[in-house]
Amino acid sequence: MFRKARRVNVRKRNDSEEEERERDEEQEPPPLLPPPASGEEPGPGGGDRAPAGESLLGPGPLPPPPSAHHPGLGAEAGGGISGGAEPGNGLKPRKRPRENKEVPRASLLSFQDEEEENEEVFKVKKSSYSKKIVKLLKKEYKEDLEKSKIKTELNTAADSDQPLDKTCHAKDTNPEDGVVISEHGEDEMDMESEKEEEKPKAGGAFSNALSSLNVLRPGEIPDAAFIHAARKKRQLARELGDFTPHDSEPGKGRLVREDENDASDDEDDDEKRRIVFSVKEKSQRQKIAEEIGIEGSDDDALVTGEQDEELSRWEQEQIRKGINIPQVQASQPSEVNVYYQNTYQTMPYGASYGIPYSYTAYGSSDAKSQKTDNTVPFKTPSNEMAPVTIDLVKRQLKDRLDSMKELHKTNQQQHEKHLQSRVDSTRAIERLEGSSGGIGERYKFLQEMRGYVQDLLECFSEKVPLINELESAIHQLYKQRASRLVQRRQDDIKDESSEFSSHSNKALMAPNLDSFGRDRALYQEHAKRRIAEREARRTRRRQAREQTGQMADHLEGLSSDDEETSTDITNFNLEKDRILKESSKVFEDVLESFYSIDCIKAQFEAWRSKYYMSYKDAYIGLCLPKLFNPLIRLQLLTWTPLEAKCRDFETMLWFESLLFYGCEDREQEKDEADVALLPTIVEKVILPKLTVIAETMWDPFSTTQTSRMVGITMKLINGYPSVVNADNKNTQVYLKALLLRMRRTLDDDVFMPLYPKNVLENKNSGPYLFFQRQFWSSVKLLGNFLQWYGIFSNKTLQELSIDGLLNRYILMAFQNSEYGDDSIRKAQNVINCFPKQWFVNLKGERTISQLENFCRYLVHLADTIYRNSIGCSDVEKRNARENIKQIVKLLASVRALDHAISVASDHNVKEVKSLIEGK
């Protein structure tokens, strides 16, 4: 979590007597001494520093040791003059810049740096060797150094393609300069490292010297020079790419002088905290491996191995130091001095700097035998690369060639694909450019049509409610007139029935109320007025029949009393004119192109002829019937097929205008919507109009109105079979309206009075005339019902006409009628109302079941006529026999052959076969 600070196990040694003496001498002014001669013997402690200087600074003449009381001290501690000060000039020695430097800033969460920087470096006094031994060691060191230099040059030539960024070069020392290694050898080595570029040839020797500083004797405490050399070695390994630090924490030691790089510590910390967004530069070994095509896995494995090896070595060093050093600290100063004197006497020179006991460790076998058992050897990380063979290079090149061939093949396929895509795109462009002709005009036309349709719909959204109101008003006007006529007929029937029933029954009634609970005086007053009006209408109808010569064939009750008063006619016409006037003002503020069927049709015909596909895709053929619906309903506002002067809708302008819509030279499809334009309009406009007429205006008692309704219905069925059929919803609604109106008439308007036969004997009496009128009106209604044959089903008609009217009312009138010629005539008129198709396909000798009661009445009528003729004159018998033959013929006409044969056999009618065949 936090960065660990690298610890340097440097402990401060106890003060000795010699150090106290040296501090006393330093307080005294230094004497001015001449520079020592080259052949002068080194002082105490000087001999052991000279070899170290040679090992660190490279080969060359050994400089004379300074005259100092303590080994390792430079000119500042001794009496010599350092730098460029001449002897005897009296100048004070130059102070070190380290003393004036500020204490570096401590790292976060660590106080170790400040303690380590302020501690004094522990120095070990070493015993002097003799001059002879020193010379011998120098000679052997030079020989070993030359051998190592040759080896270094060979390694440098192998790595010549990757020059080192920074190379440590040793400084050539001149014996005459009098410069010696001071107490702070680290500072002077930093000063010499700044001149690396001036002396590049010395780098190999220095690298070789650093590579040998990898062994530390157990219990030995490294000094500043050793620590600095180790840091230089590690820095060099990092720069060469052969070593990766085993921890990611910033190093606490400084590779250069503290006075020159104090500010670099803070920069390093900032760099460690800063997120790196750039690509990390590869090491020189990795670059070389990539150039020759070797995979990076070997180099990664090598770096990982070196990291593990370095980590293991560092751990063992720390363990060894922790075990041995406390023993040194626990001893007395005198014992320590004795221990170090004995150690230096038995230890070969240079062992404290990582050199294996002597300078002969580089190639001498004697040096190997001098190692003790407690020395732990560590393998120096090698900077050499893995061997590269011809086969390896050939294999890598072959693999790379194969991969390039595969890549080339893929690129070639992509190239061909792009070429084909380019050709297809070119063709598509040409095709689109060729087909783009008229798109602008088409877009312009469609935009105009879009605006026109929007305006048309906005106009209709405002005008359609007005059209609906006018249509409702005209329907209400016709409904009121029809209801008034029906109500008048019902009142006349009630008046006559009340009048004749009171005469026949002579019932006692309340003085002020009639039989219906009405005010007698007021009712009688209104009844008198209605009777006068009714008789006046009948007189006018009789006069009209006399003028036309139809008086002889007319039967009372067959005519319809639909005459209106002048007041009603005037009011009706005024209201009708008002509605028509308002209808003419509906589109008076609208342009003709938005209400004229011809103009609207022309717009869509232009669209259809120019851009038929878009016209078809927009389903205009399905929208046109709904679009023309309000305009057609406005023209059909007063259209009523019940009137004699009603105009046929197929002769109107809107029908003629839309009749040839979409008819062009090209062949039309069967399922095209434009072909069904007029049938769809008939379905959506005409049928709903007829439904309203059937519910509110049609009178089933009126033969004329019924004939006209049947005529228009059959015309629609025959002329528009695709829409006017039993499966069509609007057709079903229309037929239901007709059927409901007939049922209502049957329940509300049919009335058959029952009088005793003695009352009906007087054929000029009011009850007889009223009875005859009601009978013939029922027969008339039966005929009107049966006019719908072919429209309604046989079952529906038989149920409505035979069961509901004939068997319920007419047969009851037959029972009260006189048996004779009048009954036969009435029966003949009833049978004439039946459709002949009912009896054509009957099998057997029996008629339809609903007519069984009527046939029995005819058989009973024949028997009654025969019984009445017994005992009469021959003329009466002959008339009775003719009536019986007529009854047999009537039975045969309704396919009641069983009853006809029975009557003929009972009454000895011999011409049965001729009567049946001549039916």
From Swiss-Prot:
The protein's name is PAX3- and PAX7-binding protein 1
One Gene Ontology BP term is:
regulation of skeletal muscle satellite cell proliferation
Which Cys pairs does UniProt list as disulfide-bonded? none
**GO CC annotation, single:** nucleus
Biased-composition ranges, Basic and acidic residues, are 163-174, 237-258
Crosslink site(s) for Glycyl lysine isopeptide (Lys-Gly) (interchain with G-Cter in SUMO1)?
Answer: K151
Positions carrying Phosphothreonine are T565
